[in-house]
């Protein structure tokens, strides 16, 4: 991702060779030094990691911090598949199925996926009423905030805490619930208006028909007012 940012997008702030290896006296960087380089841009994520149980485990085992999961030179775009207990998950490389870490990874992954599904369902509900011409600005704002909660929860994965990630996911779920309620109310308003329009059209039709028949009667020869 850093190479794409630098070479394709032209982002000169993206890390390059010199950031880890130096300029003139280039050498092999210490593992801890690379983590410090990452923290210059990913400061919040790094701070969450430093306060997590993984920090002490990495230090005691001599495992690199950021590189252990994200690599060094070939840093790929992150995805939710990296989390959890699936075949592509990184957690299972160290945590056995009976371990606490395995269960925590499973729970965090499920909470993230649940929020994603809830957001998708809310988008579909809001989209349907929006296509009917209803005002859904507030519902869309709720969905945007829920997406922000999802992004924040993904960052807080680095706490490796089911409770901390779960609390953020709950914030997102609350916003999604509000969006769904707004969409439901908009749908009910649309149905009420539609019934009102139908009733009004029916009244106009009856009035017009009555008036037409009255005129026809009056126009017949020999009929008086």
Predicted regions and their residues:
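Inter-heme linker and motif-flanking segments adjacent to c-type heme-binding CXXCH motifs
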Residues: 1-117, 121-124, 128-138, 152-163, ...
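Amphipathic alpha-helical bundle/coiled-coil segments
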Residues: 94, 143-150, 166-180
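Juxtamembrane interface at the cytosolic side of transmembrane helices
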Residues: 205-225
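Long, amphipathic, charge-rich alpha-helical segments that form helical bundles/coiled-coils
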Residues: 139-154, 196
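Alpha-helix boundary/capping detector
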Residues: 117-120, 172, 198, 205, ...
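Juxtamembrane/start-of-transmembrane alpha-helix segments at the extracytoplasmic/lumenal side
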Residues: 184-203
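Long hydrophobic alpha-helices with heptad-repeat/coiled-coil character
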Residues: 33, 146, 222-225
């Amino acid at each position: 991702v850093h190479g794409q940012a630098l070479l394709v997008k032209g982002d000169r702030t993206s890390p390059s060779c010199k950031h880890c290896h130096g300029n003139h006296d280039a050498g092999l960087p210490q593992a801890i030094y690379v983590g410090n380089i990452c923290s210059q841009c990913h400061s919040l994520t790094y701070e969450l990691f430093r306060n997590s149980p993984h920090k002490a485990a990495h230090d005691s085992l001599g495992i690199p911090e950021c590189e252990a999961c994200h690599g060094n030179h070939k840093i790929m775009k992150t995805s939710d598949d990296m989390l959890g207990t699936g075949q592509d998950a990184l957690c299972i490389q160290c945590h056995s199925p009976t371990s606490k870490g395995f269960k925590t990874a499973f729970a965090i992954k499920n909470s993230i996926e649940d929020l994603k599904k809830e957001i998708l369902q809310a988008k579909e509900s809001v989209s349907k009423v929006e296509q009917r011409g209803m005002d859904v600005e507030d519902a869309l704002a709720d969905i945007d905030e829920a997406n922000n909660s999802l992004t924040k929860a993904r960052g807080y994965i680095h706490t490796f805490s089911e409770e901390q990630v779960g609390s953020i996911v709950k914030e997102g779920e609350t916003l999604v619930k509000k969006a769904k309620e707004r969409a439901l109310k908009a749908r009910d308003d649309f149905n009420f208006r539609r019934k009102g329009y139908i009733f009004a059209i029916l009244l106009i039709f009856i009035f017009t028909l009555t008036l037409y028949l009255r005129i026809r009667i009056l126009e017949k020869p020999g009929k008086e007012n």
